[in-house]
């Protein structure tokens, strides 16, 4: 049972990694988006780093090692009993698992 679970996690990780790489390749290969690529390069300089607030710009998080960080939001109750939404750039759990498996694979296979 452990082997099946480990194999399943590895399969999902490899699929996530390959699909993310394919999407990046398609974005870069499209000649019509040359100007948008230049704009993206400028936007990368202004991207929001990990663990910083992204409440006002939910799609402006930087890229991590393998995946782009996602804006994760939570509801916070202030002392005056008002609910506000706070968001930060972070790595989702399934991306953390994928990075862990890829890291182990790189250590094992070179």
Curated annotation (Swiss-Prot):
Signal peptide: 1-20
Domain of life according to the entry: Eukaryota
Residue ranges listed under propeptide: 21-44
Subcellular localization(s) per the UniProt record: Secreted
Tissue-specific expression: Expressed by the venom gland.
Organism annotation: Lycosa singoriensis
Domain notes: The presence of a 'disulfide through disulfide knot' structurally defines this protein as a knottin.
Keyword Amino-acid biosynthesis: no
Molecular-function GO terms, alphabetical: toxin activity
Keyword terms: Disulfide bond, Knottin, Secreted, Signal, Toxin
Pfam families: Toxin_35
Protein name per UniProt: U1-lycotoxin-Ls1dd
Disulfide bridge positions per record: 47-62, 54-71, 61-89, 73-87
A single GO cellular-component term on record: extracellular region
């Amino acid at each position: 049972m452990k082997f099946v679970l480990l194999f399943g996690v590895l399969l999902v990780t490899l699929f996530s990694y390959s699909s993310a790489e394919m999407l990046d390749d398609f974005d870069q290969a499209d000649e019509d988006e040359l100007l948008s690529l230049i704009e993206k390069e400028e936007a990368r300089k202004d991207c929001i780093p990990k663990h910083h607030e992204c409440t006002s710009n939910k799609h402006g998080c930087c890229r991590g090692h393998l995946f782009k960080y996602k804006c994760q939001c939570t509801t916070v109750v202030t002392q005056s009993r008002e609910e506000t939404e706070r968001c930060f750039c972070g790595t989702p759990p399934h991306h953390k698992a994928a990075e862990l498996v890829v890291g182990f694979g790189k250590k094992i296979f070179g």
